[in-house]
Protein backbone atom coordinates (compact mmCIF):
# COMPACT_ATOMS: atom_id res chain seq x y z
CA UNK A 1 0.00 0.00 0.00
CA UNK A 2 2.86 2.37 0.80
CA UNK A 3 5.12 2.80 -2.27
CA UNK A 4 8.19 3.89 -0.27
CA UNK A 5 9.72 0.87 1.48
CA UNK A 6 11.35 2.96 4.20
CA UNK A 7 8.11 4.74 5.07
CA UNK A 8 6.31 1.38 5.03
CA UNK A 9 8.91 -0.03 7.42
CA UNK A 10 8.55 2.95 9.75
CA UNK A 11 4.76 2.46 9.79
CA UNK A 12 5.20 -1.25 10.52
CA UNK A 13 7.60 -0.50 13.38
CA UNK A 14 5.11 2.04 14.73
CA UNK A 15 2.28 -0.52 14.64
CA UNK A 16 4.35 -3.25 16.33
CA UNK A 17 6.03 -0.89 18.83
CA UNK A 18 9.02 -3.17 19.61
CA UNK A 19 11.24 -2.50 22.63
CA UNK A 20 14.34 -2.81 20.45
CA UNK A 21 15.13 -2.71 16.75
CA UNK A 22 18.13 -4.91 16.01
CA UNK A 23 20.17 -4.05 12.91
CA UNK A 24 22.86 -6.03 11.10
CA UNK A 25 25.72 -3.89 12.44
CA UNK A 26 28.83 -4.79 14.41
CA UNK A 27 32.13 -3.12 15.16
CA UNK A 28 33.75 -6.46 16.04
CA UNK A 29 32.40 -9.07 13.61
CA UNK A 30 32.37 -8.48 9.86
CA UNK A 31 29.95 -11.38 9.42
CA UNK A 32 27.41 -9.46 11.52
CA UNK A 33 27.97 -6.08 9.87
CA UNK A 34 26.10 -6.18 6.59
CA UNK A 35 24.00 -3.01 6.69
CA UNK A 36 25.27 -0.51 4.12
CA UNK A 37 25.61 3.15 5.08
CA UNK A 38 23.12 4.21 2.40
CA UNK A 39 20.52 1.79 3.76
CA UNK A 40 21.19 2.97 7.30
CA UNK A 41 20.73 6.61 6.29
CA UNK A 42 17.50 5.84 4.41
CA UNK A 43 16.19 3.97 7.44
CA UNK A 44 17.24 6.75 9.82
CA UNK A 45 15.53 9.39 7.67
CA UNK A 46 12.29 7.40 7.62
CA UNK A 47 12.20 6.65 11.35
CA UNK A 48 10.82 8.79 14.09
CA UNK A 49 13.31 9.82 16.79
CA UNK A 50 11.69 7.41 19.28
CA UNK A 51 12.03 4.55 16.79
CA UNK A 52 15.64 5.45 16.02
CA UNK A 53 16.51 5.46 19.74
CA UNK A 54 15.47 1.79 19.94
CA UNK A 55 18.19 0.65 17.51
CA UNK A 56 20.67 -1.90 18.84
CA UNK A 57 23.23 -4.16 17.17
CA UNK A 58 22.03 -7.62 16.14
CA UNK A 59 25.63 -8.83 16.46
CA UNK A 60 24.90 -11.67 18.91
CA UNK A 61 21.96 -12.87 16.82
CA UNK A 62 24.00 -12.73 13.61
CA UNK A 63 26.92 -14.65 15.07
CA UNK A 64 24.59 -17.19 16.73
CA UNK A 65 22.82 -17.74 13.40
CA UNK A 66 26.13 -18.40 11.64
CA UNK A 67 27.13 -20.82 14.40
CA UNK A 68 23.88 -22.77 14.14
CA UNK A 69 24.09 -26.10 12.31
CA UNK A 70 21.45 -28.69 11.54
CA UNK A 71 21.96 -32.35 12.38
CA UNK A 72 22.58 -33.06 8.68
CA UNK A 73 25.20 -30.31 8.50
CA UNK A 74 26.92 -31.67 11.60
CA UNK A 75 26.98 -35.11 9.99
CA UNK A 76 28.59 -33.69 6.82
CA UNK A 77 31.13 -31.41 8.53
CA UNK A 78 33.62 -34.14 9.56
CA UNK A 79 33.75 -35.26 5.92
CA UNK A 80 34.40 -31.67 4.82
CA UNK A 81 37.26 -31.42 7.30
CA UNK A 82 38.64 -34.80 6.24
CA UNK A 83 38.65 -33.66 2.60
CA UNK A 84 40.41 -30.42 3.62
CA UNK A 85 43.10 -32.31 5.55
CA UNK A 86 43.56 -34.82 2.71
CA UNK A 87 44.06 -32.01 0.18
CA UNK A 88 46.65 -30.38 2.45
CA UNK A 89 48.39 -33.73 2.99
CA UNK A 90 48.69 -34.22 -0.77
CA UNK A 91 49.74 -30.60 -1.30
CA UNK A 92 52.52 -30.94 1.27
CA UNK A 93 53.75 -34.23 -0.23
CA UNK A 94 56.80 -34.71 -2.43
CA UNK A 95 54.40 -35.48 -5.29
CA UNK A 96 53.53 -31.77 -5.33
CA UNK A 97 56.49 -30.02 -3.70
CA UNK A 98 59.88 -30.27 -5.37
CA UNK A 99 62.30 -28.54 -2.99
CA UNK A 100 64.35 -25.74 -4.57
CA UNK A 101 61.86 -25.55 -7.45
CA UNK A 102 58.26 -25.23 -6.17
CA UNK A 103 57.22 -21.78 -4.95
CA UNK A 104 54.60 -20.95 -2.35
CA UNK A 105 52.55 -19.40 -5.16
CA UNK A 106 52.79 -22.66 -7.15
CA UNK A 107 51.44 -24.48 -4.11
CA UNK A 108 48.62 -21.96 -3.56
CA UNK A 109 47.45 -22.43 -7.14
CA UNK A 110 47.83 -26.20 -6.85
CA UNK A 111 45.41 -26.07 -3.89
CA UNK A 112 42.92 -24.00 -5.90
CA UNK A 113 43.15 -26.35 -8.90
CA UNK A 114 42.77 -29.45 -6.73
CA UNK A 115 39.63 -28.02 -5.11
CA UNK A 116 38.23 -27.13 -8.53
CA UNK A 117 39.02 -30.62 -9.85
CA UNK A 118 36.95 -32.03 -6.98
CA UNK A 119 34.00 -29.83 -7.96
CA UNK A 120 34.30 -27.77 -4.78
CA UNK A 121 35.21 -24.15 -4.16
CA UNK A 122 37.59 -22.39 -1.82
CA UNK A 123 36.06 -20.30 0.93
CA UNK A 124 38.96 -17.84 0.73
CA UNK A 125 42.17 -17.68 -1.28
CA UNK A 126 44.61 -20.15 0.30
CA UNK A 127 47.91 -18.86 1.63
CA UNK A 128 51.22 -20.64 2.08
CA UNK A 129 54.04 -19.07 4.07
CA UNK A 130 57.60 -20.10 4.77
CA UNK A 131 59.47 -19.84 8.07
CA UNK A 132 63.23 -20.26 7.74
CA UNK A 133 66.19 -20.68 10.02
CA UNK A 134 68.05 -18.12 7.92
CA UNK A 135 65.86 -15.04 7.97
CA UNK A 136 67.64 -13.15 5.17
CA UNK A 137 66.42 -15.63 2.53
CA UNK A 138 63.11 -14.06 1.59
CA UNK A 139 62.36 -15.75 -1.73
CA UNK A 140 59.21 -17.83 -2.09
CA UNK A 141 60.92 -21.01 -3.32
CA UNK A 142 60.36 -23.90 -0.92
CA UNK A 143 63.70 -25.26 0.31
CA UNK A 144 64.87 -28.12 2.55
CA UNK A 145 64.71 -27.03 6.19
CA UNK A 146 61.70 -24.76 5.60
CA UNK A 147 58.69 -24.82 7.88
CA UNK A 148 55.56 -24.32 5.79
CA UNK A 149 52.25 -22.93 7.02
CA UNK A 150 49.02 -23.19 5.03
CA UNK A 151 45.70 -21.46 5.70
CA UNK A 152 43.08 -23.23 3.62
CA UNK A 153 39.33 -23.60 3.50
CA UNK A 154 36.75 -25.15 1.21
CA UNK A 155 33.00 -24.70 0.87
CA UNK A 156 30.40 -27.43 0.49
CA UNK A 157 26.65 -27.25 1.08
CA UNK A 158 26.88 -23.86 2.83
CA UNK A 159 29.55 -25.20 5.17
CA UNK A 160 33.09 -23.83 5.24
CA UNK A 161 36.27 -25.37 6.58
CA UNK A 162 39.11 -23.20 7.83
CA UNK A 163 42.21 -25.29 8.39
CA UNK A 164 45.75 -24.26 9.23
CA UNK A 165 48.55 -26.80 9.14
CA UNK A 166 52.33 -26.87 9.16
CA UNK A 167 54.80 -29.07 7.35
CA UNK A 168 58.54 -29.34 7.64
CA UNK A 169 60.67 -29.95 4.53
CA UNK A 170 63.37 -32.43 5.49
CA UNK A 171 67.02 -31.60 4.89
CA UNK A 172 68.86 -34.17 2.71
CA UNK A 173 70.41 -35.89 5.76
CA UNK A 174 67.19 -35.94 7.84
CA UNK A 175 64.61 -38.69 8.19
CA UNK A 176 62.41 -36.85 10.71
CA UNK A 177 61.80 -33.26 11.75
CA UNK A 178 64.25 -31.79 14.31
CA UNK A 179 63.53 -32.78 17.92
CA UNK A 180 63.09 -29.15 19.01
CA UNK A 181 60.44 -28.58 16.32
CA UNK A 182 58.54 -31.75 17.26
CA UNK A 183 58.70 -30.71 20.93
CA UNK A 184 57.46 -27.19 20.15
CA UNK A 185 54.48 -28.51 18.20
CA UNK A 186 53.72 -31.05 20.92
CA UNK A 187 53.58 -28.24 23.51
CA UNK A 188 51.45 -26.10 21.18
CA UNK A 189 49.01 -28.97 20.62
CA UNK A 190 48.80 -29.52 24.38
CA UNK A 191 47.95 -25.84 24.87
CA UNK A 192 45.24 -26.13 22.18
CA UNK A 193 43.77 -29.09 24.07
CA UNK A 194 43.69 -27.07 27.28
CA UNK A 195 42.07 -24.05 25.66
What are these regions (language model features)?
Residues 1-195:
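Active-site neighborhoods and metal-handling regions in enzymes and metal-associated proteins
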Amino acid sequence: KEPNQWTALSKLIDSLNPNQIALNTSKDYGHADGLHLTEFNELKNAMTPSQFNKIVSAEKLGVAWLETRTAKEMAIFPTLLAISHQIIKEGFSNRVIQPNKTSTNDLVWWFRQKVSDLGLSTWFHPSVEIQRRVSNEKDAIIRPGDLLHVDFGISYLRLNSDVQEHAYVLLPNETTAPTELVSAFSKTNRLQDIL
